[in-house]
Every structure is written in C-alpha cells, then in structure tokens.
C-alpha cells in the first residue's frame, strides 16, 4: 500500500487567554476574575500546550482533546466578540491567516487540528496496522464532518467549506483504501476487491471535485488526489476483468481491461503505477490474444458496471458525539444567561403576582365598594395632598404639549412630501420609474392623513379629559375628611376585609421579593449544566398556590357581603331617610373621586396612545427621508 497523505496542522497566533478572559469576567459578569485565577492560568497553559506544537503525537492529540473539551465549556459561559483568534491555513503553498472573534472559529480550528493529528498518526502506521489506520482516518473525517454540520453563515468567510469537504472525502478515500489493502492482504476474491477499489476512486473523485475549486489547497495536492482517483478506477476495472476471466467471460474481461487501460493514463507516475500498468498491459495482451484465437467472445461496447461498496464513514469521536462535557474549570462562574434568565423570570414572577393575586383582589374590593350605599364612605377613603392633585394638572399639560409637538412633526413631514411632489414633473426625464414614485408619494399622503386623524382623536379626548378634570372639586378632595366611624356591622366587615386584602397584597409582594428564583437557577445549572430553566420556574411559582386559593375564597366572601348589603338596602328602600351633612359630604367626595379616577385612566391611556403615535410618525419620517435620498 502506498504512503497515505496527511492533513498538516494549522498554526495559530498566541493569545493571552488568562488576561483576556479575566477582562471579560470583570467587565460582563457579576463576579471578579481574581476568584478564578487558577482556572484562567490553566486555560492559558492548555491552549499553549495544544496549539503551539506542530508534531503529530498521541500526547499532542490528548492535549488538543482536553482543550477542545474546555472550549465547549467556555462557549457556554463566555460571550462572543471579546477575544480575537488568528489561524493560518497550511494546505497551500504559503500560509495565510484568518481572524475572527467568535468562539466557534477557535473551536472549529481546534477540531480541524484533531482531525489533522489523526490523519498524521494514520499516515505513520505500517501495513500491519491497517485496521487502526482506517479507524483514525474515519475519525479524522468525523472531525471535518462535524465542522460542516455545525458551520454557521457568519463563519463562512473565515472557514472555507470547499476545503473542508475536500479533506473530508480525502480521509474517507484513504480509509477505504485501507479496507482495500486489507482485502488484498487477505487474498479476497477479485469481485469484492474491485467493488472496494471503485469506491476508493469515487471518494478521491469527490475530494478532487472540491479540492480543485478550493482557494486554499495547493496544486500539487489537487493533482495527487486526481491521479489517485484514476489509479483506483483502473484497479477496480482490472480486478473486475480478473473476475470475468475466472468466470470464462473473456469478452467482458477484455472490455474491462480496456477501460482500466484508459483510466491508468490519468494516474500519473507514482511508484505503484508503473508496475501495475505493466501487469495490466501484459494481462490485456494475453487475454485479447486468447479471445481472438480461441474463445472468440463478443467484446461489448459498454464496459460492465461495477457496483461500488463503501466500508467507511465519518466517525464522531466521543467528545463531539456527546457534546458539552462537565469540567471543573470555572465551575462557579455563572454564565450571563443565568443572570439574564433570572432577571426575566423575576419580571414574569412579578407579573404573575400582579395578574393572579394583586389585580383580582383589587378588583374584588372595587366590586365590593361599588355595592355600597351612596352615603357610605369607601373603606380607606382619604383626601389628596395639594401636590398629588397638581400632578394631574401637570400631566394633562404635558399631554397637550406632546400633542402639539407631534402636530408640528407631521407638518414637517407634509412639507417634505409636498416638496417631493413638485419635483417629480421636473425630474420625469431622469427617472424611468416616475409612475412608481408618484404611487409612493400618494401612499405617504394617505399615511399622513391617517396619522393626522389619529392625532385629532387624541386631542379631542385630551380636551374632554381636561374638561372633566376642571369639574372636580379640588377643595373637597384636598381637605382632610373628618368622618366618624360607621356603626353599621356590615360596613365594618367591608372595611375589615378591604384592609385585610391590601395587607395581604403587601405580604405577597414582600414574599415575592424575598423568594427570587436565582438561587434555584444557580443550583440547577451547577448540577446539570443546562440552561433550560422553564421547568424550574414553573415549579418555583407553586409557592403562590395558597395565595391563588385565597383569591378564590375571596370571591365567596364578596358574594356573602354583597348579599348582606343588598338585604339591608332592601329593608331601607321603603323608608324615607333625610340625608345628613355627612351623607352629602360623602356623596360629593365619592363623585369627585370617581371623576378623578376617570381622569387618571384617560391620562394613562393617552400616554400610551401618544407614544404609539410618535413611533408611527417616526417610521413615516424615516420612510420619506429614505425616499428623498434615493430619488
């Protein structure tokens, strides 16, 4: 068997991983790098040992595998675009570098070197180690296959796909060649040897298809791969001819030898080619003479087909097939994802409390208060300070100012559109898409009319809200209430339940703040290494189960109290009752408070409305500006 061709190791520039990783920790994590000083030094030493050597030894392979395992862990913990890595291609006449700040660029080049070392180890093995060499070559192919399958578009400019496909098929070709050589050594029949050889040729042919268009691979290697493809095609047809000779199918045998003779012309002048070519020619001359004089069999115009058989495939090494493995380095360093997930879950937890505890309890209180007689004070009803009342006036004034600014911006956009409209006829001779420009301007005019309509609606609602606010009795709402406690037992129950619920809301909010999910996420991550935290969050929310039950019980208590209030109102409905000054004060206060609540709701909705309108106007402004710049 001829000497195998190995993939040379890529070279890389040295990187101070210790300093750069420390800087990342200090700038982007919630921890300090000094805690991880030993881990940082270990990573730095690991990269230097595995990548700065160009030899193909088992110890170097082990160092590469260890660093590769570490890289998987670093990718899970550290963000991209922080460290620049430079690697040099070595398959060409001269090495040239590619640089990227993506972790996967570093990872893929390390995996490439693992594949290269395995190919170098295979090439150093003798004919008595064909099985081991075949395994190494398939694992080398597995490394290149992994790179292809995990390649992202962002890396296509720094890792050439055609080159990877070329070396992948080169490794498979040589692994198949080992199987062919073992078959020869074991004196297998000619037919299976022919099928094995043709698949060797096919792998070399596929490798050549990519190698010849690779910007990296040197011409000499491209020529070598092509010649190997022709050589093994010739070998396959030669062995097929011997198979036909054994079966006394001399016409097919001669035709197969003719095909082999054609193929060997492209096989170059390698040490194995010349003796094989002589053997091939001698065999053809003998068989052709015997067939012409003795057997007289028809020689077909088409060469008999050989069905190739593949005995090899890319084999993923354990490290690549199992994915991320646990390592002790940076075990206590929490990835940014953990902190960000914690923050996101805190927001969801607060919303959960709001939606399923606080809002329902507030709604139950409101429903209960709406069932009170008009002359009964609302539980917890109190006056506003002058400052609190003035906030409403200032906010309304701010809405009016915001509305005016939006109107001015629409006026500016309208003037831009009008200017574009006047220019269109003058520029008609310079633009082939004149009609299209008119359609665009017309569409912009429709959009601005729509936005102006929305703005008028908002201004009208703001005016109505201002009018409502002006009817609110400021003096009444800002004067401290002096009301005697009620003697009505049902009202006392309402007051007690109202206070209980607001106290309960405060306790639940306190419980939520004191029981954040971060400790659970940290514990789960350290135990499993997984960043899938949704199941943990769902389990975490179960601490509010009793609070949800309290809300459900509150609905029943509400119904009972409302029934009592309705019964009392029914008893009093037939009686003539004179309103006391206290009753009148309460009714007036509740009326003004209701108006102020309406003003508050309108203000909140108005703020959202104007912000959305501002965004839509901004989009229109950008579209119009882009159109004018292009026209």
Swiss-Prot record:
Domain BRO1, chain residue ranges per copy: 3-368
Gene Ontology cellular component list: endosome; peroxisome
Domain of life: Eukaryota
Residue spans crossing the bilayer: none
InterPro entries given in the database record: ALIX_V_dom, BRO1_dom, BRO1_sf
GO biological process: invasive growth in response to glucose limitation; protein processing; sporulation resulting in formation of a cellular spore
CDD domains assigned to the protein according to its UniProt record, in alphabetical order: BRO1_ScRim20-like, V_Alix_like
Subunit (UniProt): Interacts with RIM101 by binding to its two YPX[LI] motifs.
Family that this chain belongs to: Belongs to the palA/RIM20 family.
Functional description taken from the UniProt entry: Required for the proteolytic cleavage of the transcription factor RIM101 in response to alkaline ambient pH. May act as a scaffold protein that recruits the calpain-like protease RIM13 via VPS32 to its substrate RIM101.
Protein name: pH-response regulator protein palA/RIM20
The organism of origin for this protein: Eremothecium gossypii (strain ATCC 10895 / CBS 109.51 / FGSC 9923 / NRRL Y-1056)
Phylogenetic classification of the source organism: Eukaryota, Fungi, Dikarya, Ascomycota, Saccharomycotina
Gene: RIM20
């Amino acid at each position: 068997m001829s000497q195998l061709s190995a993939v040379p190791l890529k070279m890389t520039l040295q990187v101070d991983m210790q300093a750069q990783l420390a800087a990342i920790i200090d700038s982007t994590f919630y921890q300090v790098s000094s805690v991880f000083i030993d881990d940082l030094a270990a990573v730095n030493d690991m990269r230097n040992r595995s990548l700065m050597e160009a030899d193909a030894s088992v110890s170097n392979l082990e160092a590469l595998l260890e660093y590769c395992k570490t890289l998987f862990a670093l990718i899970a913990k550290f963000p991209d675009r922080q460290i620049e890595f430079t690697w040099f291609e070595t398959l060409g006449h001269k090495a040239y570098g590619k640089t990227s700040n993506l972790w996967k660029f570093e990872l893929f080049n390390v995996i490439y070197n693992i594949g290269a070392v395995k190919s170098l180890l295979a090439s150093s093995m003798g004919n008595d180690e064909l099985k081991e060499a075949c395994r190494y070559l398939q694992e080398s192919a597995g490394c290149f296959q992994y790179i292809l399958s995990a390649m992202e578009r962002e890396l296509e400019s720094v890792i050439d796909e055609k080159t990877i496909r070329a070396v992948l098929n080169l490794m498979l070709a040589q692994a198949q060649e080992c199987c062919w050589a073992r078959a020869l050594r074991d004196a297998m029949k000619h037919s299976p040897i022919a099928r094995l050889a043709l698949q060797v040729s096919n792998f070399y042919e596929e490798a050549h298809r990519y190698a010849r268009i690779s910007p990296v691979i040197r011409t000499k290697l491209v020529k070598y791969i092509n010649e190997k493809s022709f050589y093994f095609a010739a070998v396959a047809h030669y062995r097929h001819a011997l198979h036909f000779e054994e079966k006394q199918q001399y016409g097919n045998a001669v035709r197969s030898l003719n095909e082999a003779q054609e193929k060997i012309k492209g096989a170059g002048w390698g040490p194995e080619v010349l003796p094989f070519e002589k053997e091939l020619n001698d065999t053809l001359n003998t068989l052709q003479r015997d067939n012409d004089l003795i057997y007289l069999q028809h020689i077909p115009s088409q060469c008999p087909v050989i069905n190739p058989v593949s005995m090899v495939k890319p084999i993923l090494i354990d490290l690549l097939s199992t994915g991320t493995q646990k390592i002790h380095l940076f075990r206590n360093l929490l990835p940014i994802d953990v902190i960000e997930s914690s923050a996101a879950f805190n927001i969801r937890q607060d919303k959960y409390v709001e939606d399923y505890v606080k809002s329902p309890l507030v709604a139950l209180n409101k429903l209960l208060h709406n069932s009170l007689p008009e002359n009964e004070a609302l539980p917890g009803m109190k006056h506003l300070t002058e400052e609190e009342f003035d906030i409403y006036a200032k906010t309304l004034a701010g809405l009016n100012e915001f509305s005016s600014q939006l109107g001015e911006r629409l006026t500016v956009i309208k003037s831009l559109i009008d200017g574009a409209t006047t220019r269109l006829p003058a520029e008609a001779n310079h633009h082939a898409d004149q009609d299209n420009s008119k359609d665009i301007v017309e569409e912009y005019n429709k959009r601005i009319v729509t936005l102006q309509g929305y703005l008028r609606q908002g201004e009208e609602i703001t005016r109505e809200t201002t009018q409502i606010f002006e009817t609110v009795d400021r003096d009444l709402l800002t004067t401290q209430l002096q009301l005697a406690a009620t003697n009505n037992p049902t009202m006392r129950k309402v007051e007690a339940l109202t206070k209980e619920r607001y106290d309960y809301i405060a306790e639940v909010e306190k419980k939520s703040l004191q029981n954040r999910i971060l400790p659970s996420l940290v514990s789960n991550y350290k135990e499993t290494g997984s960043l899938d935290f949704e199941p943990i969050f769902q389990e975490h929310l179960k601490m509010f189960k009793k609070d949800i039950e309290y809300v459900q019980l509150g609905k029943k208590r509400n119904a009972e109290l409302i029934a009592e209030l309705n019964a009392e109102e029914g008893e009093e409905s037939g009686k003539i009752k004179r309103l006391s000054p206290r009753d009148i004060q309460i009714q007036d206060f509740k009326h003004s408070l209701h108006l102020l609540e309406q003003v508050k709701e309108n203000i909140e909705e108005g703020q959202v409305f104007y912000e959305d309108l501002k965004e839509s106007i901004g989009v229109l402004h950008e579209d119009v500006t882009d159109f004018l710049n292009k026209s």
